[in-house]
């Protein structure tokens, strides 16, 4: 089972973005879901299944990533490759992904229907998708937090639980490119 994570950002402006695999950073390109799958077929699936995302200023948007969600995996890929809001918005507009470490692999590549990004502040819902980490982009860079325990032993949501975000560049320093 993968180390699952949430990738999130709060938009600083209103913008409409449709995921464009050709606008991904050179160091973190698009890839098909299956290694033996034709790249052109995967691109057709993405084009057919992806929808425009309407980001609103001040709103938080998040996607799920199944593999390598720990700081040394997804965190390093984010810090090294997704350095400005436009690049982050394009990634979020890809929708939920199997992986983003090394290659961005949205679930739409295998023909799945596009699911709009979560458009709510980070909170207990993150635990409900079985994610272990949250990666959050800010104008100051990427931050990461383990998902805290939002529920007591009886399954009742605790009040006042917060994420303990740390700069990803510090948490994963030994794994980052210079």
Predicted regions and their residues:
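Short loop/turn segments at secondary-structure transitions that flank enzyme active sites
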Residues: 1, 13, 68-71
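Short beta-strand scaffold segments in enzyme catalytic cores
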Residues: 4-9, 49-53
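Short regulatory "switch" loops immediately downstream of catalytic or recognition motifs
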Residues: 7-24
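Extracellular beta-rich globular recognition domains, centered on the fibrinogen C-terminal
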Residues: 58-86
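Low-complexity intrinsically disordered segments
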Residues: 80-178
């Amino acid at each position: 089972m993968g180390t699952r994570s949430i990738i999130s950002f709060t938009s600083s402006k209103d913008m409409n973005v449709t995921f464009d695999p050709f606008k991904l950073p050179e160091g973190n390109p698009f890839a098909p879901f299956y290694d033996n799958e034709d790249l052109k077929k995967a691109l057709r699936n993405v084009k057919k299944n992806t929808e425009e995302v309407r980001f609103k200023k001040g709103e938080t948007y998040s996607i799920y990533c199944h593999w390598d969600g720990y700081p040394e995996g997804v965190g390093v890929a984010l810090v090294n490759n997704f350095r400005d809001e436009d690049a982050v918005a394009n990634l979020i507009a890809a929708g939920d992904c199997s992986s983003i470490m090394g290659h961005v692999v949205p679930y739409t590549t295998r023909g799945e229907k596009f699911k709009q990004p979560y458009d709510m502040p980070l909170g207990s819902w993150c635990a409900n998708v079985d994610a272990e980490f949250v990666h959050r982009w800010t104008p100051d860079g990427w931050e990461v937090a383990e998902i805290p325990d939002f529920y007591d032993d009886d399954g009742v949501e605790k009040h006042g639980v917060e994420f303990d975000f740390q700069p990803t560049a510090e948490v994963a320093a030994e794994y980052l490119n210079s």
